[in-house]
Amino acid sequence: MKEYCGETFSKIERTGEELSGLLFEDCLFTGCRLTDTLVRSCRFTGCRFENCKVAAPKFQGVQMLSCDFDHCDLSGVDWSALMDQRKLEMGFLPFDSLQDCSLRHCVFFGLDLKGFDFSKADLSGAVFDGCNLKGASFAQCRLQGTSFAQNDLSPGGFRGAAEDFFSLG
């Protein structure tokens, strides 16, 4: 496995390619674009992503832990597939923050998102089924077509949510 620690990656673009066997620790990604990319047997720990775009990724054996995303467009990411079951059960998340991100059609199935702040995110078409969302904030979010089946949404933080036609299951 090739390792990168504390490196900066800027404006890297990959479409329809495969990234395999890479370890990224405390790396910074700025302005990077991944479209229809297969990411296999990679690990991202403590990385920061700024102004990046990821569309329709395919993950196989990928682990992500405690990463930060700022002003990113992350479409079709299955966040629940980026952690092993043991870490999920312990309440770990692949991300620490999703600041001002577009998260259209993302999957957050079964994640412990208690108290997480999604404020101002575009969550159109996202799936939050089976999550712990107690005290999570969805203030000023776009929620059109978002699914919240089998969740505890109390107390709901949906103040100012836009296009709030969403499904509670």
Residue ranges and their predicted role:
Residues M1-G169:
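Tandem repeat scaffolds
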